[in-house]
Swiss-Prot record:
It comes from the Bacteria. The lineage of its organism: Bacteria, Bacillati, Bacillota, Bacilli, Bacillales. The keyword Hydrolase applies. This is UPF0173 metal-dependent hydrolase ABC2731. The keyword Hydrolase applies. Belongs to the UPF0173 family. GO terms for molecular function: hydrolase activity. Pfam families: Lactamase_B_2 (PF12706). SUPFAM superfamilies: Metallo-hydrolase/oxidoreductase. Disulfide bonds: none annotated. Keywords: Hydrolase. It comes from Shouchella clausii (strain KSM-K16) (Alkalihalobacillus clausii).
Length: 228
């Protein structure tokens, strides 16, 4: 399994001949190396409905026919936007797809999509994290979240090989809370995400990784790939 980081919270997974994108915020993301008009995807997983996570989902899904997996309200909203291939889920639920197993975990954040043209904010269900398992490996993408005590339970119940945790502060947990989350989750490797995209979430990811136990964390540069 190949896992790549593409800035902000964008993660790409390649497994079993399938390409999976998590939170494909590309247009407007000055940190990413992806092009929304050319990126390929068989599956798009969405942690929640904020614009900087839904990103280019609709355009990519329409162009590629990708399956969009999200909590029920967000999946329904994607359908309203013309996405034909959606799979609704809910927090705590899991489903075995042909490309891997997806389970939605709790996250403490908001979830809504801002329609700037009409100045409307659309409710898109509960925010979540995602546990993705394939090829005997489990990845935890926490989405946007505060630190919460059930992260201990997530770590106890699921042996996690790779965790993506937000460190930006302001909108999510910051480095200190993310360090505690790392300890509670107990992943083999933790990668910081959701930082430096906008001024309010400017952080030093290398300082965060240095604060962890040796070997527990790693900064992935934009476009960098690791193999599990």
């Amino acid at each position: 399994m190949k896992v790549s980081y593409h800035g902000h919270s964008v993660v790409q997974i390649e497994t079993g001949g399938k390409t999976i994108l998590i939170d494909p915020f590309i247009t407007g993301n000055e940190l990413t190396d992806l092009n929304a008009d050319h990126v390929e995807a068989d599956v798009i997983l969405l942690t929640h409905g904020h614009n900087d996570h839904v990103g280019d989902t609709v355009a990519i899904a329409k162009r590629t026919g990708a399956l969009v997996v999200a909590v029920a309200e967000l999946a329904t909203y994607m359908g309203f936007q013309g996405v034909e291939n959606v799979h609704p889920m809910s927090i705590g639920g899991a489903y075995q797809f042909d490309f891997g197993r997806v389970k939605f975990t709790q996250a403490f954040h908001g979830s809504s999509f801002t329609e700037e043209d009409s100045q409307k904010i659309v409710y898109t269900g509960m925010p979540g994290g995602i546990l993705f398992t394939a090829e005997g490996k489990t990845i935890y993408h926490a989405g946007d979240t505060a630190l919460f005590s059930d992260m201990k339970l997530i770590g106890e119940r699921h042996p996690i090989d790779l965790a993506f945790l937000p460190i930006g502060d302001n909108f999510t947990m910051g480095p200190e809370d993310a360090k505690t989350a790392t300890e509670w989750i107990g992943a083999s490797l933790t990668v910081p995400i959701h930082y430096n995209t906008f001024p309010p979430i400017k952080q030093d990811p290398h300082a965060f990784v240095t604060s962890l136990q040796s070997g527990e964390g790693r900064v992935l540069e934009v476009g960098e790939t690791i193999e599990l």
